[in-house]
A protein has these predicted regions:
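Conserved N-terminal structural module of periplasmic/extracytoplasmic solute-binding proteins
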Residues: 2-9, 17-119, 133, 358, ...
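Extracytoplasmic/periplasmic substrate-recognition and gating elements
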Residues: 174-176, 266-270, 312-379
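Glycine-centered hinge/linker elements that transmit conformational signals in sensory
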Residues: 193-194, 242-278, 328
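Extracytoplasmic/periplasmic solute-binding protein
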Residues: 153-159, 164, 189-247, 286
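Conserved C-terminal helix/tail region of periplasmic/extracytoplasmic solute-binding proteins
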Residues: 174, 199, 406-463
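Hinge/lid segment of periplasmic solute-binding proteins
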Residues: 111-163, 220, 324-327
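A structural signal for short loop-to-beta-strand junctions that line the ligand-binding cleft
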Residues: 103-105, 135-173, 205, 335-340, ...
């Protein structure tokens, strides 16, 4: 990465900077903190797909760069891609944020990591900028909350959210004698469908559920939390107790979720273990297994179609006819009957950015109604701007948008407090242990409890 040094902080109030920047783009040369660095060059870091043929983010940012440079003569935008699987991306990003020599002006932050980076002092609070930005009122409150620190300040502008459910191959299901309008009521229904695929459709992976430490947060959120949050009635968080502000040790629901994962791999209903523990398994699910009819069921996210749209490199215009969608059921079919997890990403400004004010102007360009809608559709994302969500042009833009948007009613958000990344890693280790058979469910749960105490500094409770 090219180094970015910060320039000395000025004594002018941030709110004054916002007013100046909004009023006159040409004054942006004077806007920005830090020491050194080129005040006319904005460095924007982003997560680049590990699949060379998928250029969704690259194409979108290139268009925003063009718009921004045209509106701000003399300013240049340098796009700084980080090409890595999720777990490696987070590590590389944090390394960049530690020094003014390497910190970009704008970074793409997963909401699960943002509180950890806030606590580490890596990010700049955006409240002075947001106070002068009328469009901020258009964002839904839950999306805003995902980018808030424990200090009550906001550190990121969300660019969409997501939900999760079950994708299934209608062709594989037909061969397995399963219905095209499949909607499982319980976890056992999901496993039974996978068993039918295994028995009747040889050569096809019956079910993919992400697992293990190499896969990173996808294992925790797409699989484990989709299971864990379906073990109760949805009224309380099974991972974190908000009243006591303590993390919850492995209880029955936790063990049941591990048992589901163990069952998938013990009965060989999932991919080969070596494939399941490949950091790039998600790329294979989207780019190979589903399009080629080699996978029966995928527990995955709303964003998958971004890899199949025109210009994506893996064009698959028939996907909406060849794939079915079903909500993930609760464990025993108990109310509310369905479960989803939501996360999303935000644009954040590093504390050591050279040009923070210029960076926020770039965020405002990205988040106009038109540009935000363009991104939601291209990225197969769920809108976080109320005006876009209410626009028929958005809901009709792509098959599946309405289905996944409706799951917001049943969705949950991770307790993304500073300890969460370490808690998530402990979950992944427990999953990996039962996937490989290195530990029983009971052993993995005990090891998790020990790791949880370390991750949470002893702030744990049992329920």
């Amino acid at each position: 990465m090219r180094p970015t040094a910060a320039r000395p902080r000025t004594t002018v109030r941030p709110t004054a900077f916002v007013a100046l920047c909004a009023a006159a783009p040409l004054l942006l040369t004077a806007c920005g903190g830090g020491s050194g660095g080129d005040p006319d060059t904005l460095k924007v870091s982003f997560k680049q797909s590990t699949d060379n043929s998928v250029k969704v983010m690259d194409t979108y940012l290139a268009d925003i760069k063009k718009q921004f440079e045209k509106a701000n003569p003399g300013k240049k935008v340098e796009l700084v891609p980080i090409k890595a699987p999720d777990a490696e991306y987070y590590t590389k990003l944090q390394q960049m944020l530690r020094s003014p020599r390497t910190a970009p002006d704008l970074v793409y932050e997963d909401t699960f990591l943002i509180n950890s980076d806030i606590t580490s002092g890596y990010l700049k609070p955006l409240d002075p900028y947001l106070a002068g930005w009328k469009d901020w009122d258009r964002f839904i409150d839950t999306a805003k909350a995902a980018a808030k620190g424990e200090d009550g300040k906001t550190y990121g502008v969300p660019d969409g959210t997501d939900t999760r459910g079950l994708w299934f191959s209608k062709d594989v299901f037909a061969k397995a004698g399963l219905p095209a309008d499949w909607q499982p009521r319980t976890w056992e229904d999901v496993l039974d469908a996978a068993r039918a695929v295994k028995k009747r459709v040889p050569g096809v992976i019956p079910l993919n559920v992400y697992t293990g430490k190499p896969v990173g947060e996808a294992a925790t959120m797409q699989t484990f939390e989709m299971l864990l949050y379906g073990t109760n009635d949805g009224s309380s968080d099974p991972l974190y107790d908000k009243d006591s502000k303590k993390w919850i040790t492995a209880g029955k629901g936790f063990r049941d979720a591990l048992t589901f994962v163990e069952t998938v791999y013990k009965e060989k209903l999932g991919p080969d273990v070596a494939d399941a523990l490949d950091p790039n398994v998600g790329t294979r699910v989207r780019g190979e297994w589903l399009p080629q009819g080699r996978l029966g069921i995928a527990l995955d996210g709303s964003w998958l179609p971004q890899d199949w749209l025109e210009g994506s490199g893996h064009e698959w215009p028939e996907w909406s006819k060849e794939l079915g969608l079903a909500a993930m059921p609760t464990q025993h079919g108990q109310a509310p009957g369905k479960v989803s997890m939501s996360g999303g990403w935000t644009w954040a400004i590093p504390a050591k950015a050279a040009n923070p004010d210029l960076a926020f102007e770039f965020v405002k360009t990205m988040q106009t109604k038109a540009n935000a809608q363009k991104w939601y559709v291209a990225n197969s994302g769920i809108a976080v701007r109320e005006d876009v969500a209410a626009d028929p042009a958005y809901t009709a833009a792509q098959p599946g948008i309405r289905f996944f948007t409706d799951l917001v009613e049943h969705t949950h958000y991770r307790p993304a407090y500073p300890a969460y990344p370490k808690v998530s890693t402990a979950i992944q280790e427990a999953m990996e242990a039962v996937t490989t058979g290195d530990a029983s469910v009971e052993e993995a749960a005990r090891d998790y409890d020990e790791a949880l105490r370390d991750a949470a500094g002893g702030q744990v409770t049992s329920k």
